[in-house]
Amino acid sequence: MKHRVVGRRLDRTTEHRTAMFKNMVTSLLRHERIVTTTPKAKELKRFADKVITQAKRGTPHARRLAHRDVRDVEVLNKLFDTLAERFKARPGGYTRIVRVGRRAGDNAEMSVIELVDRAPAAAPEAEEKGEKKAAKAPKAEKAPKAEKKPAKKAAKAE
């Protein structure tokens, strides 16, 4: 019977599964967007939301608890300094899952899992790229094409 059993096994041992999700949470927080299979993304959403909620508390004990799942100190600092401030007003639901189709090799359903408020970090880069394109000199107009004439038939030799 499957009473009170929470989570997916994903055909892995307990140690492999926990290590995989710790690595995936770290990657998600570092890059703020990763591509994975849909069942892994759904399970990762639970892990990531718990870690971000701990970071919002901001206490030393919360940092120790988050350090169990996020072993990279650089990512842990990013979580507590920038991401906790970004999600301070949001009561939950820090991640979004978008299905992107199927993988070519094994036809597994793939999804993108990303942090919800990642637009502020990407907006300045997009504006800079737009300004660079506008600064380029306009291209010269193309010369009009010559009219096409039918090819002359070769004169028959008599």
From Swiss-Prot:
GO terms for cellular component: cytosolic large ribosomal subunit. One of its GO terms (molecular function) is structural constituent of ribosome. It comes from the Bacteria. Coiled coil: none annotated. One of its GO terms (biological process) is translation. Keywords: Ribonucleoprotein, Ribosomal protein. Residues 126-158 have a biased composition (Basic and acidic residues). Residues 119-158 are annotated as: Disordered. The keyword Ribosomal protein applies. The keyword Signal does not apply. Pfam families: Ribosomal_L17. Part of the 50S ribosomal subunit. Contacts protein L32. Belongs to the bacterial ribosomal protein bL17 family. NCBIfam families: L17. This is Large ribosomal subunit protein bL17.
